[in-house]
Amino acid sequence: MKDLVDTTEMYLRTIYELEEEGVTPLRARIAERLEQSGPTVSQTVARMERDGLVVVASDRSLQMTPTGRTLATAVMRKHRLAERLLTDIIGLDINKVHDEACRWEHVMSDEVERRLVKVLKDVSRSPFGNPIPGLDELGVGNSDAAAPGTRVIDAATSMPRKVRIVQINEIFQVETDQFTQLLDADIRVGSEVEIVDRDGHITLSHNGKDVELLDDLAHTIRIEEL
């Protein structure tokens, strides 16, 4: 039963992430993200549809029902609160935080959540700049807001310019090699970097180091103008 619950939560969280990135949630995208076969994803989505968690729209996109969105919000809230705890209190290496929080999100109790919002200094966003949703359910002012800034893919031009990193989406943290390159260049949320689009390839420059973003990740970092 626990495996079934964990799978449901992973699917809902993935749909939530895709929406956050501005990507249409399709079964094919879930298959890519979770590295599962098409038939497996279709079977799981069909079960979730029967359970009243998602609806498959006419364009084949997946839409969460109010019940599904409530559950997805709770999972993401636990995940990002765990990231704050692991970073701010425990001091875990930033490159290990996401994977560890993925484990915590399935087992964190409501009571622990309520304690965390009292213990942590900042519960508005994760260490990666992602909004922590559904805080109103824990008695904290609701931080549900549009993602800050602009996607790098929408902002970069052939003319280099300085910007500030404000958000690094979940999927970027999973791409170990690319995330390591970012950390090696000391690029974090709040870093001022130079961005440029060179023949369709976006590069971030910081402290004399360049990071060329993979094409399928250029939409997962958000910036604001200086």
UniProtKB/Swiss-Prot annotation:
Q: Which UniProt keywords apply?
A: Cytoplasm, DNA-binding, Iron, Repressor, Transcription, Transcription regulation
Any single GO BP term: negative regulation of DNA-templated transcription
Q: Which family does it belong to?
A: Belongs to the DtxR/MntR family.
* Gene name for this UniProt entry: dtxR
Localization (cell): Cytoplasm
Top-level taxon of the source organism:
Bacteria
HTH dtxR-type domain: which residues?
4-65
Drop me one GO molecular function for this one: DNA-binding transcription factor activity
- Source organism lineage? Bacteria, Bacillati, Actinomycetota, Actinomycetes, Mycobacteriales
Q: Name one GO cellular component term.
A: cytoplasm
Protein name per the record: Diphtheria toxin repressor
Using the UniProt record, give the first listed, main subcellular location.
cytoplasm
Question: Which species does the entry assign this protein to?
Answer: Corynebacterium diphtheriae (strain PW8)
> Disulfide pairs?
none
Its biological purpose is as follows: Iron-binding repressor of the dipheteria toxin gene expression. May serve as a global regulator of gene expression. Represses ripA under iron excess.
Describe the subunit structure: Homodimer.
